[in-house]
Swiss-Prot record:
Belongs to the shikimate kinase family. GO terms for molecular function: ATP binding; magnesium ion binding; shikimate kinase activity. CDD domains: SK. This is Shikimate kinase. Catalyzes the specific phosphorylation of the 3-hydroxyl group of shikimic acid using ATP as a cosubstrate. The keyword Cytoplasm applies. Pathway: Metabolic intermediate biosynthesis; chorismate biosynthesis; chorismate from D-erythrose 4-phosphate and phosphoenolpyruvate: step 5/7. The lineage of its organism: Bacteria, Pseudomonadati, Chlamydiota, Chlamydiia, Chlamydiales. The gene is aroK. Keywords: Amino-acid biosynthesis, Aromatic amino acid biosynthesis, ATP-binding, Cytoplasm, Kinase, Magnesium, Metal-binding, Nucleotide-binding, Transferase. Monomer. InterPro entries: P-loop_NTPase, Shikimate/glucono_kinase, Shikimate_kinase/TSH1. It comes from Chlamydia muridarum (strain MoPn / Nigg). Its EC number is 2.7.1.71.
Length: 184
């Protein structure tokens, strides 16, 4: 089995419901790294209020400022971090993340039909509720994320523990394979 570089802070971004939290938690476990979910950290700062309630209270600009404060307080250590579905699209937040040392920023991607099905099963994020066309809004957001992220990883719907392990290993092989140092 190859050796994986576990010195990076791995930031996972993607559309809502792509699996940032689920995959991030499994990847962190696979790599024996701490896991942070910025939505959960934000909620904890507001005594358990949901990101939706925080967004409704502060509006988009205030919500982004609260997300930025959450990220500023995030330890700069090797870990896996699941970002909110729109977090990276805020310029200040993007700059804060990309100016950190030794990071890996990866866009998680899924077939659009799978993602759309997942979104139908739970309440939409506030920023997507009043869009004339959900499909167009998602495509536009995805295009912006693709421009901002240097790496893309396609997730598949893994169900068994074996499949989940294979997906985590595939991610690590693609992005975290340690460079072998040849002997002199």
């Amino acid at each position: 089995m190859p050796t994986f570089d576990t010195t990076k802070q791995i930031f996972l971004c993607g559309l809502p419901s792509v699996g940032k939290t689920s995959f991030g938690r499994l990847l962190a476990q696979f790599l024996s790294l701490p896991f942070f979910d910025t939505d959960h950290l934000l909620s904890a700062r507001f005594h358990g209020d949901s990101p939706k309630a925080i967004y409704q209270r502060f509006g988009e600009e205030g919500f982004c400022q609260e997300e930025l404060l959450t990220l500023i307080n995030l330890p700069v250590i090797p870990s896996v971090v699941a970002l909110g579905g729109k977090t990276l699209l805020d310029k200040q937040i993007y700059e804060h993340i990309t100016q950190r040392e030794n990071i890996l920023l990866v866009l998680l991607d899924l077939p659009f039909a799978t993602l759309y099905q997942r979104l139908q099963k739970k309440p939409l994020p506030e920023s997507l509720k009043n869009t004339p066309s959900l499909e167009n809004a998602l495509f536009q957001r995805l295009e912006k994320l693709r421009l901002l992220t240097p790496h893309i990883f396609s997730l598949q719907a893994a169900t068994s523990l074996h499949e989940i392990g294979e997906v985590c290993q595939s991610f690590c092989l693609q992005f975290l394979t340690a460079q072998e140092i040849p002997y002199a």
